[in-house]
Amino acid sequence: HASAHASVRLREDDRRAVHGKRNYTYSDVVRSVLGGRKFQLCGLAQYINLVGVTIGYTITASISMVAVKRSNCFHKHGHHVKCYTSNNPFMILFACIQIVLSQIPNFHKLWWLSIVAAVMSFAYSSIGLGLSVAKVAGGGEPVRTTLTGVQVGVDVTGSEKVWRTFQAIGDIAFAYAYSNVLIEIQDTLKSSPPENKVMKRASLIGILTTTLFYVLCGCLGYAAFGNDAPGNFLTGFGFYEPFWLIDFANICIAVHLVGAYQVFCQPIFGFVENWGKERWPNSQFVNGEHALNFPLCGTFPVNFFRVVWRTTYVIITALIAMMFPFFNDFLGLIGSLSFWPLTVYFPIEMYIKQSKMQRFSFTWTWLKILSWACLIVSIISAAGSIQGLAQDLKKYQPFKAQQ
């Protein structure tokens, strides 16, 4: 609810130009409405989140690719075999793909990318749900389920359950923290029909659809596996067969994240490149465009600064992912740190200022309560994720992650 409400407020603010200047990015909106220190804080929060998301996507994509290899190993040698596989080669492969894709100019004009991402997301979500339904309907070994989830003293200690609950809240927050790229996406839409109305409809449909899938995955997954449910049905091997269907679902995840990585890193690329142009306006290395001919592709514009900077960024995110390949804890931390400021606080503050809302009115009070409640959620989820990362690091050797 908070994510949907804040996105509506953000769309209402984004096209209210100040001093005749149209806003093209999330940070532009914050600067034009709130200005000063809040703009700086917004930029810091936004870019930390975007960097964290790209690292998280590198981890997730590699886990899915590893799952494909392990699935074939289990099918060939049996479920009793360990089939340990290193994540690192797949992170390197993912990084190589991203290095190539990051050099594509005007990446935001690849309209078909959104269609591919939507199809992939629907495919792997549907497969996960279908396999859960099949497991529940097929019976088999009984699973342990309780009204309050995992049992204290049986599955976990009391403190472990509290920390895991906090971490799970962060994972949920990560899933809904899309507001920081909402303006950039809206800017790619045509002006007719009005893009803010189109984006409002798309956002509401998207939130309702994803919420439906999240609830179904949670409920059906717990019904299928009970207290032993893995963190990820498709990569945690809650299912082994049909192996080809599980492979297909994991490939869909990887393909989805190939495009999603680019969507979230484009604002970072643009920010640094614009800064470079302002800092060194006469530099040919920074500003020069060179036409290169590629067979079957025609002429391709190349900028040396863009090549070096974007390649370096992808390599750095891949190295960090190799050092800290902790899926749930890492995503939970990103979600908890970015959810309140970017998804709740700034959209609400901008709406209050733009509408000249009277202090302590009913709406003002309700919005403030919503904002403070979400801040508390972010704090406790960050604590849970940090505790989880601390536990993971105690038994982890960098660059030696295996599944």
How should each PLM-predicted stretch be described?
Residues 1-14:
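N-terminal signal-anchor/initial transmembrane insertion module
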Residues 96-99, 315-320, 375-382:
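Hydrophobic core of alpha-helical transmembrane segments in multi-pass integral membrane proteins
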